[in-house]
Swiss-Prot record:
Keywords: Endoplasmic reticulum, Fatty acid metabolism, Lipid metabolism, Membrane, Microsome, NAD, Oxidoreductase, Phosphoprotein, Transmembrane, Transmembrane helix
Quaternary structure and interacting proteins, as annotated: Homodimer.
Modified residues (Phosphoserine): 293
Cellular component GO terms, alphabetical: endoplasmic reticulum; endoplasmic reticulum membrane; membrane; mitochondrial inner membrane; mitochondrion
Lineage of producing organism: Eukaryota, Metazoa, Chordata, Craniata, Vertebrata
Classification via InterPro entries: Ald_DH/histidinol_DH (IPR016161), Ald_DH_C (IPR016163), Ald_DH_CS_CYS (IPR016160), Ald_DH_CS_GLU (IPR029510), Ald_DH_N (IPR016162), Aldehyde_DH_dom (IPR015590), Aldehyde_DH_NAD(P) (IPR012394)
Protein name stated in the entry: Aldehyde dehydrogenase family 3 member A2
Gene name of the encoded protein: Aldh3a2
Cell compartments where the protein resides: Membrane; Microsome membrane; Endoplasmic reticulum membrane
Motif (Prevents secretion from ER): 481-484
Topological category with respect to the lipid bilayer: Single-pass membrane protein
Gene Ontology biological process terms from the UniProt entry: aldehyde metabolic process; central nervous system development; epidermis development; fatty acid metabolic process; hexadecanal metabolic process; peripheral nervous system development; phytol metabolic process
Record-stated family: Belongs to the aldehyde dehydrogenase family.
Pfam families: Aldedh
Molecular-function annotations in GO: aldehyde dehydrogenase (NAD+) activity; long-chain fatty aldehyde dehydrogenase (NAD+) activity; long-chain-alcohol oxidase activity; medium-chain fatty aldehyde dehydrogenase (NAD+) activity; protein homodimerization activity
Length: 484
């Protein structure tokens, strides 16, 4: 591992990854890989999660193609220097912010969307000019295998590497020094990643999870709400970090919600859900048994059927759920949807705020003021009103958590920013010492007074303002020179 990181660092220090042209070439190569080897990629995803190729494409591949296209179209602007506002003391100088690559970064992907959650951060790392090591999840072994086969064929092997393996390999990787680590996964492992990174003072982006609440107001179109909630909850068999984890609603709505979600599930997957090509399976037996244990002692209003041999767990709804029960103490990450009764929106807000900050928050209501009130009085990684999941698809929005649900963000320009250092640059001339004397010892009341004038008056170059302030500073310089 150490030699591999050193090899990438030497390649990065050569400057090869910095030119804009090189970055664009690598992004185009990555797009070509996705397009040319689409069938193999889809087959690998399907094998890992019992996912149809159509779902694999719409859930994962299309997102990567969109992210690459965004970077190809916007990278020249993202990578360019941005002029910075100046004060009077620096008005004749050049001040700007120059994005620069961090160096060698580590990307640790997740198994639930093994392609998009590994490749989307890589797109950002390449766009920002970094070298990168990619570590796919070992649980999605087929996707990890195809990535290990394809990436070296399309990307510069000296700058981009892939490491496969389990806990020992990840542990060894985390011992190495990186310039940034982006990890997607659960909170417990996120703490391990952060602890390892702290030994090298390596910054981290942690995309974790949590129990994402979904509040349904009584003033709501229940048909629309239940259709959208069922889609977001049961896609990928509930194994989505921003799936609605549980529903909060008034007790009078509970039976209606159960009935409407039951009808929606039938529309989505047919009478025989198990035979539907659109309904996936739990990733492995360990997660299956964990989900099985969450159902013990619960009132199952719908679903609950399971087949351990095929890791099938039907779309399930729980009613009259005790907030202190096990199913409400951990992220479910499966097709189990508890409904918790609250008296009103005030109680819902308190319920949410009494728990860890979630990765996502959903509110359904015809009343936009109520939706905005919930947003204002709670905290979460992201929010979608009157829908679920969809904020993930908007690459002009940052995607990330807060508190226990993570730190940092990516997607679109935010991916570029995450893997970049925003370097402040000030280029001064060698003239103007009469004004610069203000900062040289010995100090005096007069110097402090002039410093207040020069430093507290902000200046941004304008057409007329430029001429006026040049004259002002010239006069001030003469006065300062006479007084010092």
């Amino acid at each position: 591992m150490e030699r591999q990181v050193l090899r990438l660092r030497q390649a990065f220090r050569s400057g090869r990854s910095r030119p804009l042209r090189f970055r664009l070439q690598q992004l185009e190569a990555l797009r070509r890989m996705v397009q040319e080897r689409e069938k193999e990629i889809l087959a690998a995803i399907a094998a890992d999660l019992s996912k149809s190729e159509l779902n694999a494409y719409s859930h994962e591949v299309i997102t990567i193609l969109g992210e690459i296209d965004f970077m190809l179209g916007n990278l020249p602007e993202l990578a360019s220097a941005r002029p910075a506002k100046k004060n009077l003391l620096t008005m004749m100088d050049e001040a700007y912010v120059q994005p620069e690559p961090l160096g060698v970064v580590l990307i640790i992907g997740a198994w639930n969307y093994p392609f998009v959650l590994t490749m989307q951060p890589l797109v950002g790392a390449i766009a920002a000019g970094n070298a990168a090591i990619v570590k796919p999840s070992e649980l999605s072994e087929n996707t990890a295998k195809i990535l290990a086969e394809l990436l070296p064929q399309y990307l510069d092997q000296d700058l981009y590497a892939i490491v496969n393996g389990g806990i020992p390999e990840t542990t060894e990787l985390l011992k190495q020094r990186f310039d940034h680590i982006l990890y997607t996964g659960n909170t417990a492992v996120g703490k391990i990643v952060m602890e390892a990174a702290a030994k090298h003072l390596t910054p981290v982006t942690l995309e974790l999870g949590g129990k994402s609440p979904c509040y349904i107001d009584r003033d709501c179109d229940l048909d629309v709400a239940c259709r959208r909630i069922a889609w977001g909850k049961y896609m990928n068999c509930g194994q989505t970090c921003i799936a609605p984890d549980y529903i909060l609603c008034e007790a009078s709505l509970q039976n209606q919600i159960v009935q409407k979600i039951k009808e929606t599930v039938k529309d989505f997957y047919g009478e025989n859900i198990k035979a539907s090509p659109d309904y996936e399976r739990i990733i492995n037996l360990r997660h299956f048994k964990r989900l099985q244990s969450l159902l013990k002692g619960q009132k199952i209003a719908f679903g609950g059927e399971m087949d351990e041999a095929t890791r099938y767990l039907a779309p399930t709804i729980l009613t009259d759920v005790d907030p202190n029960s096990k199913v409400m103490q951990e992220e479910i990450f499966g097709p189990i949807l508890p409904i918790v009764s609250v008296k009103n929106v005030d109680e819902a807000i308190n319920f949410i705020n009494d728990r860890e900050k979630p990765l996502a928050l959903y509110v359904f209501s015809r009343n936009n003021k109520l939706i905005k009130r919930v947003i204002d009085e709670t905290s979460s990684g992201g929010v979608t009103g009157n829908d679920v999941i969809m904020h993930f698809t908007v690459n002009s929005l940052p995607f990330g958590g807060v508190g226990a649900s993570g730190m940092g963000a990516y997607h679109g320009k935010y991916s570029f920013d995450t893997f970049s250092h925003q370097r402040p640059c000030l280029l001064k001339g060698l003239k103007g010492e009469s004004v610069n004397k203000l900062r040289y010892p010995p100090n005096s009341e007069s110097k402090v007074s002039w410093a207040k004038f020069f430093l507290l008056k902000q200046f941004n170059k304008g057409r007329l303002g430029m001429l006026l302030f040049v004259c002002l500073v010239a006069v001030a310089a003469v006065i300062v020179k006479d007084q010092l």
